[in-house]
């Protein structure tokens, strides 16, 4: 069987149309179809040239053009030249618009935009896991945001929440016996946020944490004198850095995240 040609025309990359064409071609033994992709078409001149080529080569045109004017031009030009042109995405857009009572944006490349956004989120989530709890201080200088605070100030959940907003977050625990990593004093203060909490609230949280682990809630970890020592040390560190401090005593993670994002936009 002679190989036949299909021109895949798109105002984006053309991957969607090519996959559909290849899926259809796979239904024929030996798949006697050659696909030529014509991506990122923005003008009618290019469409007319493709129609002329399709006529000359007795080819089919399969296309994904989201702008109605471009779709109509291609269909009209193809019909005039006796070329078969198949609209892959247009009818579905119109059906969805009618059924859902929504107006399409008619903007090319939106799948690619969504894919990029998705991968940015995944990258940020992986970053937050990798640089959680001061595991690797090298992440401090690579982060969009650096969170610091004593234990149980919601650093990890806040890091994950911000990661879902496509922000790369590293967090560092502040402990009197451990010298803060030098990178903490090299990062710009505008990227660093200290998480402050009242001693009473922190005591309550830590005691509940110990109970949930089946441990004695009178351990040094949940001792008021120890907590005050940690918070005093924290105050010294954030003062040295010169970063903003947010009181998270009675704030939900979402509320704290909102404050941070607003400060970043300044």
From Swiss-Prot:
Known InterPro entries for this protein? Kinase-pyrophosphorylase, PPDK_reg
Q: Per its UniProt entry, what is the enzyme's top EC class, as one word?
A: transferase
Pfam families this protein is in? Kinase-PPPase
The record's catalysed reaction(s) read: N(tele)-phospho-L-histidyl/L-threonyl-[pyruvate, phosphate dikinase] + ADP = N(tele)-phospho-L-histidyl/O-phospho-L-threonyl-[pyruvate, phosphate dikinase] + AMP + H(+); N(tele)-phospho-L-histidyl/O-phospho-L-threonyl-[pyruvate, phosphate dikinase] + phosphate + H(+) = N(tele)-phospho-L-histidyl/L-threonyl-[pyruvate, phosphate dikinase] + diphosphate
Entry binding sites for ADP: 149-156
Question: What's the EC number here?
Answer: 2.7.11.32, 2.7.4.27
PANTHER family, A to Z? PYRUVATE, PHOSPHATE DIKINASE REGULATORY PROTEIN 1, CHLOROPLASTIC (PTHR31756:SF3)
HAMAP family (alphabetical): PDRP
The similarity annotation says: Belongs to the pyruvate, phosphate/water dikinase regulatory protein family. PDRP subfamily.
Name this polypeptide is given: Putative pyruvate, phosphate dikinase regulatory protein
Q: Which organism is it from?
A: Geobacillus thermodenitrificans (strain NG80-2)
